[in-house]
């Protein structure tokens, strides 16, 4: 398998987990608008 794809998938999973933790938390969300406003 291609290790680069695995790394990209791991990074995406980490971002999802960070988003789940951060975005409900107003100070974190305010510090990371790109993380939390990605749908817009």
Swiss-Prot record:
Disulfide bonds join 22-28, 23-36. This is Alpha-conotoxin-like Qc1.1c. It comes from the Eukaryota. Alpha-conotoxins act on postsynaptic membranes, they bind to the nicotinic acetylcholine receptors (nAChR) and thus inhibit them. Has possibly a distinct nAChR binding mode from other alpha-conotoxins, due to a different three residue motif (lacks the Ser-Xaa-Pro motif). GO terms for molecular function: acetylcholine receptor inhibitor activity; ion channel regulator activity; toxin activity. Signal peptide: none annotated. Belongs to the conotoxin A superfamily. Residues 24-26 are annotated as: Lacks the Ser-Xaa-Pro motif that is crucial for potent interaction with nAChR. It is found in: Secreted. InterPro entries: Conotoxin_a-typ (IPR009958). It comes from Conus quercinus. Keywords: Acetylcholine receptor inhibiting toxin, Disulfide bond, Ion channel impairing toxin, Neurotoxin, Postsynaptic neurotoxin, Secreted, Toxin. Residues 1-19 form a propeptide. One of its GO terms (cellular component) is extracellular region. Expressed by the venom duct. The cysteine framework is I (CC-C-C). Alpha4/7 pattern.
